Amino acid sequence: MVKSAEVRRRKKSWVGKVVSDKMDKAIVIAIERRVQHPVYKKYFKKTTRLMAHDENNDAGIGDIVKVTECRPLSKRKSCRLVEVVEKAK
């Protein structure tokens, strides 16, 4: 019998802008990235929205935050707030 080695991998982290903080202990962040069209070679922006766990309700709308992946906390939440990089003005 062959034993499979348990491989630990580094958790992914993202920096994004908070677009919603209406929920208790949860935020929605938008992560923008630039993608090149495969045929026309033009660059355009794509936005991914993630829900993240915010234990102390620190983040507000417009804040730039850093999140990291974690175990699934609910149906749509599998990220955790690490830090608020920049507060909104």
Curated annotation (Swiss-Prot):
UniProt GO cellular component terms: cytosolic small ribosomal subunit
Annotated keywords: Ribonucleoprotein, Ribosomal protein, RNA-binding, rRNA-binding
Sample GO molecular function, one term: structural constituent of ribosome
One GO BP: translation
One Pfam match: Ribosomal_S17
Source taxon at top rank: Bacteria
Assembly: Part of the 30S ribosomal subunit.
Function: One of the primary rRNA binding proteins, it binds specifically to the 5'-end of 16S ribosomal RNA.
PANTHER family: 40S RIBOSOMAL PROTEIN S11 FAMILY MEMBER (PTHR10744), SMALL RIBOSOMAL SUBUNIT PROTEIN US17M (PTHR10744:SF1)
UniProt record similarity statement: Belongs to the universal ribosomal protein uS17 family.
Entry protein name: Small ribosomal subunit protein uS17
Organism annotation: Chlorobium phaeobacteroides (strain BS1)
Gene: rpsQ
